[in-house]
Structures are given as C-alpha cells and as structure tokens.
C-alpha cells in the first residue's frame, strides 16, 4: 500500500517502512506525527484519488532526525564590471520513518 502526501509545499509518494526527508517540521526526535494531507492512496491495481484530499486518510510517521542539507553555493557576476556576489544556503530538513497508512 502506498500514499501520496503533501507536506512543506511538496508531494511525496510513501509506503510503510520507508525513510523520507521533508522540509523541517517542528517536532522532537522520536515524536510520532500524523500527515493529514493525503492526495491519493493505492494498493495494487486500486487507486483512490482525493478531490483534493482523500477523506479519512492519514499517514503516521516517526521523527528520526533533524538536520541540514549540504550547502548550495550561489554566485552572481556581471562581466566586465568587476561585480561578483557570493552566497550560500543550507536548508533544514526532518527525516521521517513512515509507520502506517490509514485509509
């Protein structure tokens, strides 16, 4: 069984037992959270799509860790004008383990 969930402005296809890195969720390590925005649920040939959400469906997950992704380097330059601008960015993430899909 799998589900398509929306969190942090992105959509993820998940199944029970998988690990998943999502945008940061303010929760303690080891806490169990519920993802309520389920867009689709499927098992084998049967797929149930929501309009826009599947009513009564949710995904239970446990927070494994909180961290930061690798640095992304931004470099802007204007040729022949001696203009250079450097910037770096590290995005925070939350790693989840999907425990169960309730449909």
UniProtKB/Swiss-Prot annotation:
Ribonucleoprotein keyword on record: yes
Signal peptide residue numbers: none
GO MF terms, alphabetically ordered: rRNA binding; structural constituent of ribosome
GO process terms (BP): translation
InterPro entries on file: bL21-like (IPR028909), bL21-like_sf (IPR036164), Ribosomal_bL21 (IPR001787), Ribosomal_bL21_CS (IPR018258)
PROSITE patterns associated with the record: RIBOSOMAL_L21
Pfam families: Ribosomal_L21p (PF00829)
Any one annotated GO CC term: ribosome
Key words, A-Z: Ribonucleoprotein, Ribosomal protein, RNA-binding, rRNA-binding
UniProt similarity note: Belongs to the bacterial ribosomal protein bL21 family.
HAMAP family found in the cross-reference section: Ribosomal_bL21
Function: This protein binds to 23S rRNA in the presence of protein L20.
Quaternary structure, from the entry: Part of the 50S ribosomal subunit. Contacts protein L20.
Protein name, entry field: Large ribosomal subunit protein bL21
Organism, as annotated: Cupriavidus necator (strain ATCC 17699 / DSM 428 / KCTC 22496 / NCIMB 10442 / H16 / Stanier 337) (Ralstonia eutropha)
Gene (UniProt): rplU
